[in-house]
UniProtKB/Swiss-Prot annotation:
Gene Ontology terms for molecular function: 2-isopropylmalate synthase activity; 4-hydroxy-2-oxovalerate aldolase activity; manganese ion binding
UniProt key word Cell inner membrane: no
Species per Swiss-Prot/TrEMBL record: Roseiflexus sp. (strain RS-1)
Coiled coil: none
Matching Pfam families: DmpG_comm, HMGL-like
Residues covered by the Pyruvate carboxyltransferase domain: 4-254
Family membership noted in the UniProt record: Belongs to the 4-hydroxy-2-oxovalerate aldolase family.
Transmembrane feature ranges: none
Catalytic residue list: 16
Enzyme class: lyase
Residues annotated for substrate binding in this entry: 12-13, 166, 193, 284
Keywords linked to the UniProt accession: Aromatic hydrocarbons catabolism, Lyase, Manganese, Metal-binding
Protein name: 4-hydroxy-2-oxovalerate aldolase
Length: 338
């Protein structure tokens, strides 16, 4: 195993868990702590990327562009990244984000739809950005298929392509097989992004590293969608124990998690029964809080909603299905004889 590059996504994936309420001061504090601890890339946007602030995905307390500007002004060494989902973020938002200081663009598509990212990669490269491809919900397709999609992203200009376990549904051998397939197919770097819905965020990341992953992601205190992500401070400790620490200050990251992030967290992401259901059913991790809220409003078990969403193979961008499924379950309850 080689020392990987770590991207911290507390200020993007963690936005889901905080209902997109990060403040300017919180961004400054988190970026400063990560930067001083040696984290090389820090991702900052709404949980659903540039222009994600909306009725569909939830409104941000502070506009993304303002948070990006705060991050760039605060970071002394780290590069600032942003996420963009084609169909949500547009050229206008990308240009504005670059003006505010974005240096790395991570372009995310469903793992079956890499072809919709071509113009976004080309525009980002024309603007001089480092580009990373994200194949979301990678558990839904076999390794060979993912490799074909990754080759498309490479041909469009991706400097790295990630296997993304959006549902936290993979087991270690799943993560390893997909990373191996991409390593065999690509000439660019390969990354892995984990979620912890089955309690395997760290384990799957290690399996990905053993399979040759060049880049990995983490969030301080595991703050992220569903049961959270692989915890940055834990990853740092594990990498150090393995002798492949890429320059991270392990103790400083522990302190950042404990004293900077933990006090602002409304809850500790954990594989509780609903989050486990996300991983078990293979559902997009961001659906968790929506399913809980709607389930409480309508008197429906969130797990029933999530399992049905998994059966229908819903993906990111189909949050409106959550209410539809819940209402259908209510109707079924009302027509079932007691």
């Amino acid at each position: 195993m080689n020392a990987p590059r770590l991207t911290d996504t507390t200020l993007r994936d963690g936005s889901h868990a905080l209902a997109h309420t990060f403040t300017r001061q919180q961004v400054r504090d988190i970026v400063r702590a990560l930067d001083r601890a040696g984290v090389p890339v820090i991702e900052v946007t709404h949980g659903d990327g540039l222009a994600g602030s909306s009725l569909q995905y939830g409104f941000s307390r502070v506009p993304d562009l303002d948070l990006i500007a705060e991050a760039r002004e605060t970071a002394e060494r780290a590069r600032i990244a942003a996420l963009l989902l084609p169909g949500i973020g547009t050229r206008r938002e990308l240009r504005a984000a670059v003006e505010r200081g974005v240096q790395v663009l991570r372009i995310a598509t469903q793992c079956t739809e890499a072809d919709i990212s071509e113009e976004h990669f080309k525009m980002a490269k024309d603007m001089g950005l480092e580009t990373v491809g994200f194949l979301m919900m990678s558990h839904m397709r076999p390794p060979e298929f993912l490799a074909e999609q990754a080759r498309l992203m490479e041909s469009y200009g991706a400097d790295c392509v990630y296997v993304v376990d959006s549902a936290g549904a993979m087991l270690p051998h799943d993560a390893a097989a997909r990373v191996q397939a991409l390593k065999a197919a690509l000439t660019v770097q390969v990354g892995f992004h984990a979620h912890n819905n089955l309690g395997l965020g760290i384990g799957n990341t290690l399996a990905a590293l053993e399979a040759g992953a060049d880049q990995i992601d983490g969030c301080l205190r595991g703050l992220g969608a569903g049961a959270g992500n692989a915890a940055t401070e834990v990853l740092a400790a594990v990498l150090d124990r393995l002798g492949i620490n890429p320059g991270l200050d392990v103790l400083a990251l522990m302190d950042a998690a404990e004293y900077v992030v933990a006090p602002i967290m409304p809850f500790q992401p954990f594989p509780d029964r609903d989050a486990i259901t996300i991983g078990y059913a293979g559902v997009y991790s961001t659906f968790l809080l929506h399913a809980r809220r709607i389930g409480e409003q309508l008197g429906v078990d969130p797990r029933a909603i999530l399992i049905e969403l998994g059966r229908r193979q819903t993906v990111a961008g189909q949050e409106d299905w959550i209410l539809d499924v819940a209402l259908e379950l209510v109707r079924q309850q009302q027509t079932t004889p007691v």
